[in-house]
């Protein structure tokens, strides 16, 4: 079995394990810790975003999305980061026609990633 096949990221869709560890200068333990912290801190992000939008607080929703975009990109969660970017752009540009579907897609991917991270 190759090293790639034994890396947890090779079995977690949406997690580029190799890139994430490389960003941390090879510190796999730190990467695992950051992924666990991400799962604990952002599991309810979609709910917070929806709550802000329901309250008419588009700035808070945008800020949440912007932060989530940066965190997911820095953790090498590219598919999720792309969906967060789409949601962020929809909110930023008041694209109310598409923002719910973007947030729904982001929420599904976020839930899947967090569920898979719980297997680490």
Could you describe each region identified by the protein language model?
Residues 1-120:
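Two-component system phosphorelay core
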